Design a protein with these regions (language model features):
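Conserved, mostly hydrophobic/aromatic
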Residues: 45, 92, 187, 229, ...
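Substrate-binding/active-site clefts of carbohydrate-active enzymes
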Residues: 153-154, 188-362, 370-393, 413, ...
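A structural motif
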Residues: 50, 224, 362-363, 542-543
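Structural preference for beta-strand elements that scaffold enzyme active sites
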Residues: 182-186, 226-228, 286-290, 365-367, ...
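Conserved alpha/beta catalytic core and glycan-binding cleft of carbohydrate-active enzymes
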Residues: 383-548, 553, 561-565, 598-601, ...
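N-terminal structural segment of carbohydrate-active enzymes
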Residues: 2-265, 280, 467-506
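Aromatic- and carboxylate-lined catalytic core of secreted/periplasmic carbohydrate-active enzymes
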Residues: 92, 576-607
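Extended hydrophobic/aromatic segments used for targeting, binding, or gating
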Residues: 220, 239-257, 554-588
């Protein structure tokens, strides 16, 4: 940050309703975002297309003071304000072209959130103020959104918040568990804790609740070495879902890649410190923290989405636009837009975010949602893309766990087995083969043997080990283990899409009756099938992943897409620990068997050589 003592007073005073202008120094173009150093705060924001950028300080009454950022280096607009301390709410206004046919959507009537914001406050109201087009006109013709109505979004949007970066990590150290010794447990912060009787009510659904000894003891009883958290970056609830009385429960709708989602904090004013405290608690028990991250798209959606940060900052830099009509967005993700990982600044944002979560928040790895999108240099998935090059060379990110969801919805997006050497992958072929085998598909026997022994056909040729295969049979997306053996068809009516959402081909078998039954033979068969699948998962070569609640037969009543169900349908029902105590005990035994016997977690593939008998030695 700047140490230049010559104070520069801004000329811009905005609407004049805020307090007197603070002292402003030139500051630095690095680091990006708002950085408090103990004496003041440096602000830095990127926009290549901007003609002017204003820093907007918001007081407790919602009044705004605008300060022109007159210093620009490498398209980064910056200033240092010695009077600004943690807790200060702020945003930016970007003046520049609003020309959608050219790919530009600057709108200074929008208070923009900091792309590097470490914390956020407030709510979105999804009124006209959030949108840079006439919503009534767009309802008539969605392709022609016209000129922006210039309705000020202050008071209708969230604000960024300056944080205190200092934290007592004590003697915290990363566990650094080797892959071949790792057992991953995929969990949802709220779903894991919302009904846990051992977690104090005021901590349920929070980072503090997840770090409660009652939860950690459960994980340790399962011999779990890493908890993989579904998205905890700050995300938005979709307007459509809110209108249906639903919510974006899963959280794959990020707009803040540096901020822990504040609705998971018991104290929203201290979300960063609470997240760090959670990580420290897990590390004390030898459990790694892996984040499910969504760097493939943002919450702003397509051309009809709100303008909350990236779109108004520099639309063409942050997003992939259609080559033949720059008004519209390429959509490899099924969400309305795709981040432009070809642009150097967007790549910088992704890498800066990853490094921040490792160095400042002490997380131990990442699972990349729809990772194939990050590898699309043009249209095809390219394992030599700039993103993979940067990860390979980065001295911090290359040393943590990197897990790819190796597909997206674009053409050629299914890339299981094709990621570079540092990466592990959610092995979708393992999932499909194990499901088919246990529902009685005889043709799968040969492939089942390959999956059981580490999927060498997918990973050995690229120099990877069996642990590159993240083995799973169920995950957040799809049936739970209980539902996999209880339903032939999805039952997603509660999602408000007439059961048209979610995967139709589930490779499931209901054992004779659709849904719940009192038939003792079917109940016994289902219990045996669940044990078969858990045993297969834990005794296969590779790195196993358990989906939260499967160890006690959690059900979603046949709903295989609970992305919008923030309710008892998706939360863990901890009473099942008693009801299904036999399955829980079995899971604990088989995970311990894996942990105790290295033969189930070999570091190398089987060589395929005949076993010599004693007479041949």
């Amino acid at each position: 940050v700047a140490s230049n003592p010559s104070a520069v007073q801004s000329d811009s005073v905005g609407n004049g309703t805020g307090p007197a202008l603070p002292t402003v120094w030139p500051g630095s173009n690095y680091p990006l975002g708002a950085t408090y150093d103990g004496g003041g705060t440096n602000f830095a924001v990127f926009s290549e297309i901007a003609e002017q950028v204003e820093l907007c300080l918001i007081d407790d009454d919602g009044n705004e003071t605008r300060i022109a950022l007159d210093e620009v280096d490498g398209y980064v607009w910056h200033a240092y304000l010695p009077a600004v301390t943690p807790g200060q709410r702020y945003g930016f206004r970007v003046h520049g072209p609003f020309d959608p046919p050219a790919g530009h959507r600057c709108d200074p009537s929008k208070l923009l959130l900091d792309p590097y914001g470490k914390a956020f406050d407030g709510e979105f109201d999804f009124s006209q103020a959030l949108f840079s087009y006439d919503m009534a006109a767009a309802a008539e013709n969605p392709s022609e959104t016209g000129t922006p109505p210039m309705v000020d979004s202050l008071g209708h949007t969230m604000t960024s918040v300056v944080i205190n970066p200092f934290f007592d990590w004590a003697s915290d150290r990363a566990p650094r568990t080797p892959y071949h010794e790792t057992i991953i447990y995929e969990a949802h912060v709220k779903g894991m804790t919302q009904t846990h009787p051992g977690v104090p009510e005021e901590l349920r659904g929070t980072y503090a609740g997840l770090a409660h000894p009652a939860v950690i003891d459960h994980l340790k009883s399962l011999n779990v070495t890493a908890i993989e958290l579904m998205p905890v970056h700050q995300f938005m609830h979709d307007q459509r879902l809110l209108e249906l009385g639903l919510r974006n429960y899963w959280g794959y709708n990020t707009f803040g890649f540096f901020a822990p989602h504040n609705q998971y904090a018991a104290n929203r004013q201290a979300s960063v410190a609470e997240f760090k405290t959670m990580v420290r608690a897990f590390h004390e028990e030898g459990i790694e923290v892996i984040l499910d991250v969504v760097y493939n798209h943002t919450a702003e959606g397509n051309h009809l989405g709100p303008t909350i940060n990236f779109r108004g900052m520099d639309n063409a830099a942050y997003y992939r636009l259609e080559d033949d009509d720059l008004r519209f967005y390429k959509d490899f993700t099924g969400t309305g837009n795709s981040l432009n990982a070809r642009h150097p600044h967007t790549l910088q944002l992704i890498m800066d975010s990853l490094r921040y979560w490792v160095t400042e928040m002490h997380v131990d790895g990442f699972r990349f949602d729809l990772a194939s999108t990050l590898a699309r240099e043009f249209y095809d998935v390219d394992r030599l893309s700039a993103f993979f090059d940067l990860v390979q060379q980065d001295p911090i990110i290359s040393q943590v766990k990197l897990i790819a969801e190796p597909w997206d919805v674009g053409e050629g997006g299914y890339q299981v087995g094709n990621f570079p050497g540092l990466w592990t992958e959610w092995n979708g072929k393992y999932r499909d083969t194990v499901r088919d085998y246990w529902r009685g598909e005889p043709a799968t026997l040969g492939e089942f043997a390959s999956r059981l022994t580490g999927s060498s056909d997918l990973y050995e040729a690229t120099g990877r080990r069996p642990s590159a295969s993240i083995n799973f049979v169920t995950a957040h997306d799809g049936f739970t283990l209980n539902d996999l053996v209880s339903y032939n068809e999805k039952h997603n009516e509660a999602n408000g899409e007439d059961n048209n959402d979610g995967e139709n081909y589930n490779r499931s078998w209901n054992c004779g009756v659709e849904g719940p039954t009192d038939d003792p033979d079917i109940v016994a068969l289902r219990a045996r099938q669940m044990r078969n699948i858990i045993a297969t998962l834990m005794l296969s070569q590779g790195t196993p992943m358990i989906s939260h609640g499967d160890e006690m037969a959690r059900t979603q009543q046949g709903n295989n897409n609970v992305y919008c169900q923030d309710s008892a349908l998706s939360w863990m029902d901890w009473s099942l620990a008693d009801k299904n105590a036999d399955l829980l005990a079995f899971t604990r035994r088989v995970t311990k068997l894996r942990a105790d016997h290295p033969v189930f977690r070999r570091r190398r593939f089987f060589a395929g050589q005949p076993i010599r008998t004693g007479d041949e030695v």
